[in-house]
Amino acid sequence: MADLSGIKPTAMTEYAHSPGLAFRSLVIGLTAFLTVVDLFATQAILPSLTRHYGVTPAAMGFAVNASTFGMAAASLVVGFFSPRIDRRTGILLSLALLAVPTSLLAVAPNLAVFTALRVAQGLCMASAFALTLAYLGEQCSAMDAGGAFAAYITGNVASNLVGRLISAALADGLGLAWNFYFFAALNLAGAALVYFTVDRVRPMHAMMPAASPLAATLAHWRNPQLRAAFGIGFCILFAFIGTFTYVNFVLVRPPLSLGMMDLGLVYFVFLPSVVTTLLAGKVAARLGTRPTIWGALTVAGLGLPLMLAPRLREVLAGMVLVGVGTFFAQAAATGFVGQAAADNRGIASGIYLACYFCGGLVGTAVLGRLFDAFGWQACIFGVGAALAAAALLTFALKR
């Protein structure tokens, strides 16, 4: 049994590596996988859901990604009260409750109910996500923190790949309803994993006098480096959502004309990201956060023109580059927030995640309108603008 609480607090082991880190990193990544597997898996069946509810791609894309609204709201609330929340209990309850809206999606009668259930999913996912990031920031040594955050983001990346493959296969073979029942079972598996691997640990900042949550929130926003990191997170998911939501409709239309199972297999494009994201912590530690993020954003930007090609090979190559670049940048930015916040890291993580997921919601709405009105090229232009904005914000981070 991997006891994650065995990772010593930063204040106690400032420069030491924690023993058994490799196995704990595996558990951390698996926890991340089971926490957010619902978030993007549904994108693999977007065309089928669009036909099922008889709506436009933009409307269905917004409904599926409404989970990001719940995630933004929950990230703020959980971050606000983070110093008073027991990490283990909060993560455990969030994952157990997540199974409820996930299973109800199987019987959602209309788009409004579907959207509301996706928001509820987001509330539960973000609560677990924010508390886990706060836990890692508090319990990892300075040397181990980058690797722990990278492992968590890698689990997130893996959930994008495996979740979409499973979703496409289940929907194709058993229908839409069984797809959601299966993911509800995965949510319960995540709760079980936390129950057996995470011991009860008091939030570090509950052990000492601390500023009020509002004062801590304002202090974080006054920090120009953290403020820039929050903006970078917004831009990253804006770009990611815009790319991987609406590319599904491009892939199933002529000249590519992929079927549902083929569409699921396309998401093997995330496989390189599973490997590269693990390196983000080491690269940022060696080169610095700014060069790391700039390099990652450049890689993502190089993929955009390829995705406009009429041939599947070029489109897939573009998807690989965008996936590798955005996930690498996200891992570097997430680790930066965890280390740049001198105190109240739970609140800082909550603000970052709220901005990150708000970027996803805004990206869905804005880029969906562009896609419906002007087509795929306009959508790609919007993605490029978001990546450029993130690159500019990176100038404000410390060297």
Model-derived segments and spans:
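Conserved MFS/SLC helix-loop-helix module at the cytosolic interface between two early adjacent transmembrane helices
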Residues: 73-109
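Cytoplasmic helix-loop-helix junction between adjacent transmembrane helices
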Residues: 117-156
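Helix-to-loop junctions at the C-terminal end of transmembrane segments
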Residues: 75-86, 276-288, 371-372
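Helix-breaking motifs and short loop linkers at transmembrane-helix boundaries and internal kinks
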Residues: 54, 86, 107-112, 141, ...
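Helix-loop-helix hairpin linking two adjacent transmembrane segments in secondary transporters
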Residues: 142-144, 151-198
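Juxtamembrane intracellular "pre-TM" segments in multi-pass secondary transporters
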Residues: 10-18, 199-230
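C-terminal transmembrane helical hairpin of 12-TM major facilitator-type secondary transporters
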Residues: 290-333
